[in-house]
Swiss-Prot record:
GO cellular component labels: cytosol
Source organism phylogeny: Bacteria, Pseudomonadati, Pseudomonadota, Gammaproteobacteria, Enterobacterales
Name this polypeptide is given: Orotidine 5'-phosphate decarboxylase
Organism: Shigella flexneri
Binding annotation for substrate: 22, 44, 71-80, 131, 192, 201, 221-222
Reactions mediated catalytically: orotidine 5'-phosphate + H(+) = UMP + CO2
One BP annotation, GO: 'de novo' UMP biosynthetic process
InterPro entries associated with the record: Aldolase_TIM, OMPdecase, OMPdecase_AS, OMPdecase_bac, OMPdeCOase_dom, RibuloseP-bd_barrel
Entry similarity comment: Belongs to the OMP decarboxylase family. Type 1 subfamily.
SUPFAM superfamilies: Ribulose-phoshate binding barrel
EC category name: lyase
Length: 245
């Protein structure tokens, strides 16, 4: 086990905002990142950017003071998923995720892989139902439950495996906080400030609505990354959340 990123080098943020980086060019991504303050948000790196630019890109972001949510949604046999999660912890990320549909043995193995990291371990979150999926999409897979019911079933399995929380839609947050408790973290994509286009997300909410629903960390992408003044956009979102708190 080798920790490659020191948490002491990062800025401390109390903001629930996680900005999704979706760039095809590393320089463009870093140019955007250099316009914003790590005290105002964390950053999410997904499959495309990690595949294109690798661990070094994550280190570049960490060196700028940002906490990183490594959104790779591991879904594999238990041993492979566990090694992947441990590799993410070695990289020093703040949060990493797996697919809850990988099952209890996979999630348990992933959690156990983080034990040696102690307090430096990242948050381990499970994905329930992708926010782009509707009931008809689940039916195509042979799942007869509604997206909300299926997500709750997967969330219950996640908590049973002692993970830190789940990725879920904002619409499920109120129910999940009631069922799973305040300590079970809810990470929600599809969050868009008032007036933003829905894009490819189907189940969306504004940041204020998400906060009221019990969302702990809200993922926001294009409304920030495509903003003329992303730093000001972030400050406005955080200010609105503080007023709503």
């Amino acid at each position: 086990m080798t920790l490659t990123a020191s948490s002491s080098s990062r800025a401390v943020t109390n903001s629930p905002v996680v900005v999704a980086l979706d760039y095809h060019n590393c320089d463009d991504a870093l140019s955007f990142v250099d316009k914003i303050d790590p005290r105002d948000c964390r950053l999410k790196v997904g499959k495309e950017m990690f595949t294109l630019f690798g661990p070094q890109f994550v280190r570049e972001l960490q060196q700028r003071g940002f906490d990183i949510f490594l959104d790779l949604k591991f879904h594999d046999i238990p041993n492979t998923a566990a090694h992947a999660v441990a590799a993410a912890a070695d990289l020093g990320v703040w949060m990493v995720n797996v697919h809850a549909s990988g099952g209890a043995r996979m999630m348990t193995a992933a959690r156990e892989a983080l034990v040696p990291f102690g307090k430096d371990a990242p948050l381990l979150i499970a994905v329930t139902v992708l926010t782009s999926m509707e009931a008809s999409d689940l039916a195509d897979l042979g799942v007869t439950l509604s997206p909300a019911d299926y997500a709750e079933r997967l969330a219950a399995l996640t908590q049973k495996c002692d993970l830190d929380g789940v990725v879920c839609s904002a619409q499920e947050a109120v129910r999940f906080k009631q069922v799973f408790g305040q300590e079970f973290k809810l990470v929600t994509p599809g969050i868009r400030p008032q007036g933003s286009e829905a894009g490819d997300q189907r189940r969306i909410m504004t940041p204020e609505q998400a906060l009221a629903a019990g969302v702990d960390y809200m993922v926001i992408g294009r409304p920030v990354t495509q903003s003329v003044d992303p730093a000001q956009t972030l400050k406005a979102i955080n200010a609105s959340l503080q007023r709503s708190a």
